[in-house]
């Protein structure tokens, strides 16, 4: 947790002091005794995590056993820490069950998903007036957030730079459905009071959005102090300079928890099929009246979605965006399958090499 110094004493204490801790987590942790303490990951570095324990904020490594099975703690995770300060050792040995996961498609050729934050109740999708406002990008974010299990809220920042912000709010609302859209200025603190219903004590809120939309300024305004460096606005492209380098967790004065995520540079979909359906609910609703159950809504006869587009009920660009995201999801799935097959092939190849080495060493070749 930001603004805490590492305590010299043991991290043992009242578990309820860990933000977001509840009875379900207490039950999950009850099997651990002795030097094991619960904690919550506040920020993640390459090989260590900053972990909020009941009575201290410490740096803890990640056990080899966790790494071997591919379990990686992320910001927001509730974890089990083997706390042995007298030996100079603190190690994350397990991750308690996650109630929500914010994921995205992993970068690179292997496909798959990358979890970037966990145990989030609400996600603020932050955009800004000017060139950053992109409805297609917001649709992507909505699909990702819906898939996480968290509640989405869209924040339109920098309204002080816009003559008619209500027009932009209506534009965003046209693709957001029932998702709240809140106009504000983090710099002048205009409209921040509208965030109160979404910042409840003990709940966790994460901020996502592209670089330069003002997330750091928003955090500073909500905390009432400068804890995140901001980069100002470049006049040539109306964007703030990208400044956040690691995810961090902050405790607001009312007891709500705020997680800041760096601007997602590669907004790829993970396993977001359900999220896409929720983000494009009007298309899914219309599809229930299609002639064919496996209709792709491209050129099939009797397609109710294409009819809705023709009748002006569904905007053509919405359907085009839906197709782009579903095509991308299918591509990601194929890429992931290819990656798994490659790993399986490499595993069998290694087994064959090991068998050959064994036979050679025992003279059975």
From Swiss-Prot:
Stored InterPro entries: G_CP_dom, NA-bd_OB-fold, P-loop_NTPase, Ribosome_biogen_GTPase_RsgA, RsgA_GTPase_dom
Co-factor binding comment: Binds 1 zinc ion per subunit.
Alphabetical GO biological process terms: ribosomal small subunit biogenesis
Signal peptide: none
Enzyme Commission no: 3.6.1.-
Binding of Zn(2+), residues: 290, 295, 297, 303
Keyword Membrane: no
SUPFAM superfamilies hit by this protein: Nucleic acid-binding proteins, P-loop containing nucleoside triphosphate hydrolases
Cofactor: Zn(2+)
Principal subcellular localization: cytoplasm
Positions that bind GTP: 157-160, 209-217
Subcellular location, record wording: Cytoplasm
GO molecular function annotations of the record: GTP binding; GTPase activity; metal ion binding; rRNA binding
Enzyme class (EC, first level): hydrolase
Pfam (any one): RsgA_GTPase
An example Gene Ontology CC term for this record: cytoplasm
Keyword field: Cytoplasm, GTP-binding, Hydrolase, Metal-binding, Nucleotide-binding, Ribosome biogenesis, RNA-binding, rRNA-binding, Zinc
Residue ranges annotated for the CP-type G domain, each copy included: 112-267
Oligomeric and partner information: Monomer. Associates with 30S ribosomal subunit, binds 16S rRNA.
Family: Belongs to the TRAFAC class YlqF/YawG GTPase family. RsgA subfamily.
Its job: One of several proteins that assist in the late maturation steps of the functional core of the 30S ribosomal subunit. Helps release RbfA from mature subunits. May play a role in the assembly of ribosomal proteins into the subunit. Circularly permuted GTPase that catalyzes slow GTP hydrolysis, GTPase activity is stimulated by the 30S ribosomal subunit.
Protein name stated in the entry: Small ribosomal subunit biogenesis GTPase RsgA
Organism: Methanosarcina mazei (strain ATCC BAA-159 / DSM 3647 / Goe1 / Go1 / JCM 11833 / OCM 88) (Methanosarcina frisia)
């Amino acid at each position: 947790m930001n603004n805490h110094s590492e305590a010299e004493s043991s991290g043992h204490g009242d578990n309820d002091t860990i933000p977001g801790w509840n009875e379900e987590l207490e039950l999950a942790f009850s099997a651990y005794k002795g030097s094991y303490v619960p904690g919550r990951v506040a920020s993640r570095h390459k090989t260590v995590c900053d972990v909020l324990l009941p009575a201290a904020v410490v740096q803890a490594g990640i056990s080899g056993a966790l790494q071997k099975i591919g379990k990686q703690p992320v910001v927001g995770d509730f974890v089990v820490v083997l706390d042995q300060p007298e030996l100079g050792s603190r190690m994350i040995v397990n991750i308690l069950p996650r109630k929500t996961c914010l994921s995205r498609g992993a970068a690179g050729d292997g496909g798959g998903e990358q979890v970037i934050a966990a145990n989030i109740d609400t996600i603020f999708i932050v955009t800004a007036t000017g060139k950053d406002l992109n409805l297609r990008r917001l649709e992507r974010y909505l699909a990702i957030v819906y898939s996480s299990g968290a509640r989405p809220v869209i924040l339109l920042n920098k309204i002080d730079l816009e003559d008619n912000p209500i027009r932009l709010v209506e534009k965003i609302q046209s693709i957001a459905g029932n998702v709240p859209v809140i106009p504000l200025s983090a710099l002048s603190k205009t409209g921040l009071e509208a965030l109160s219903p979404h910042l409840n004590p003990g709940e966790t809120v994460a901020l996502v959005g592209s670089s330069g939309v003002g997330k750091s300024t928003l955090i500073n305004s909500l905390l009432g102090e400068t804890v995140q460096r901001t980069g100002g606005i470049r006049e040539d492209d109306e964007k703030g300079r990208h400044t956040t380098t690691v995810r961090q967790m902050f405790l607001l004065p009312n007891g709500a928890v705020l997680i800041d995520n760096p601007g997602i540079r590669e907004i790829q979909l993970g396993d977001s099929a359900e999220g896409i359906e929720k983000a494009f609910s009007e298309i899914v609703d219309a599809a229930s009246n299609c002639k064919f159950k496996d209709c792709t809504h491209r050129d099939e006869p009797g397609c109710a979605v294409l009819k809705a587009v023709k009748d002006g009920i569904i905007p053509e660009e919405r359907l085009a965006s839906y197709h782009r995201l579903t095509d991308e999801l299918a591509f990601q799935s194929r890429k992931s399958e290819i990656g798994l097959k490659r790993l399986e092939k490499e595993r069998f190849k290694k087994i064959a090499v090991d068998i050959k080495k064994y036979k050679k060493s025992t003279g059975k070749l």
